[in-house]
Amino acid sequence: MKKILFRLFLSVFLVAAANAAAKTKVDIRPDGLYLTDVTVAQLEKQYELYGYKDYIYMPDWVYPPIFLTNLPTDFDRISDANRRNKLFLQIIGPLALKLRDELREERLAVRELRAAFLEGADLTPEQERFVEEKAVKYDIFTRMKGRRRYDILLKRLELKVDIVPPSLLMAAAAIESDWGTNRIVREGNSLYKELAWYTDKGLKPQDDRQDQSYRYKTFPSLYDSMKSYALRLNSSVNYEQMRLYRAEIEYREKPVFGRSLAHTMLFDSNLKNFAGLLDYTITFYELTNFDEAELGFVRLPNLEDKK
């Protein structure tokens, strides 16, 4: 799929808000435009400049790299549920594509290293550190030593370090966050109601009758929440069936779609029939389109001016 260049536009409305020392923060980076504490009106104006008027039907399925740190400050005041849901998907769609690309690069590094290892190459000390760090990250353990150790670690890493379809990430976020309206995502940027046990860090359950031994995890950004959730899917024993089924699809050289994995998500939520809810949400909102979509890239103004 071809990449599309998005010239970097900033709406006058958005720049004015930032320059007026408002809470709104605009961060221009080589990979995209990062926005913090924007209002719905500011965000929709910015989307309009990029032709991003709906979460689907973008030309060539290429999406502008506009990444929100948090949901708009007045997001929960949108009274029209249909409009609110569509804007929610517009917001998290680029984040899911960004994470998919990041996981794809991480997987490529693991696969290339394992391929060289299987051909007889010895790992350098730097490569050994890389493997050990990934093993800790993805909760992989073995008591074996030497070359046998890295054979086991790399094999297990190749199963775990893999993409999570954007449609699956988006549907799960919509369901768990009540389409971006619940307290957990508004106060803690937590899209998936992830829990932390026996700690004072995080958001307390509001109902005093609930178990007080846990907290809802909080995150610096929506993207950090999505990364944490994807890591859970790729590392926890509860999702081994999902990972094995994903590997089987890839072995047959087929694309991995969110709907293909939805039925394996039986232990992902306290909600009844969560797997069915995932399948329905992906289907009804046509989120499978995101599984084959790509992010465009921006050209910064100073680079454009030099040409």
Question: Which stretches of residues belong to each language-model region?
Answer:
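Catalytic cores of secreted/periplasmic lytic hydrolases that degrade extracellular macromolecules
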Residues: 20-171, 175-307
